[in-house]
Amino acid sequence: MNTPRRKLVLLAGQSNMAGRGYATPEDLQPIDNVEMIRPDYKWQIAIEPVTKDRPFIGTFSEDGKKIESNDPYETIMPEAGQKVCGVGLGRTFAKYLSLATNNSVIGLIPTAVGGTPVSAWQIGGQDPWDKEKYPYDEAIILAKEAQKSGDIVAVLWHQGETDANNKTQDYTEALRTVVRNFRKDLNLSDDIPFIAGNMASFYNPEISNNIDIVDNALVTLKNEEPSFDFVDTKDLNHRGDNLHFDTPSLHILGKRYFDKYMEMTGK
């Protein structure tokens, strides 16, 4: 009997897609039929953190010590025995997608990297915080590995805080290139949804004064690129740092991305 292929969901962008919400006991419990691919290409049940840019639960260094995040907003969960990277929106999206598709197995592909500008998501683009990392190139490698056992049904994107802070010129065209490159390099048809999130309303002035750079780009691409749309985040809350969504907001956001997916696919 052939194993059904996974429905794959690519998670890309910067820290608010990677996830920085506080982990709760619920977030450390498995969800039926929701899996994730790890950087070593192995599949596992998706429990938080579903991300590539922070330690996984049970990650150890070569000397046998647990590797923990140094994020001051993260808390030590007794269930994990270590600091847990924040919660993201991917698991919530996947939970609803599985239920809506006769309990299909959903495979999350976490590629988002905190702090990355849109330039890091160009072909050959470097992570400005780690010059040995190439977020877009690494995302393509991981996604292609995942495609051996599944088919990408959606790309979920949240990114732009860094570019608002940097007052990036030509953000619209840079993001358009990202969208088109993902479709080309992963052989995604024009009907595969590419869903973004607009900028929140809680940032400090150095970001909030320039969020139109990102929000206007999303409107333009919605009107000009096939199967591109975005969800609203303006009413959601931060975790205390005026930068990252809190856990309840990320659960809400995951449902909004799912609702947008269903709207775009007519399901």
Show which residues each predicted segment covers.
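Cell-envelope and extracellular/periplasmic
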Residues: M1-K267
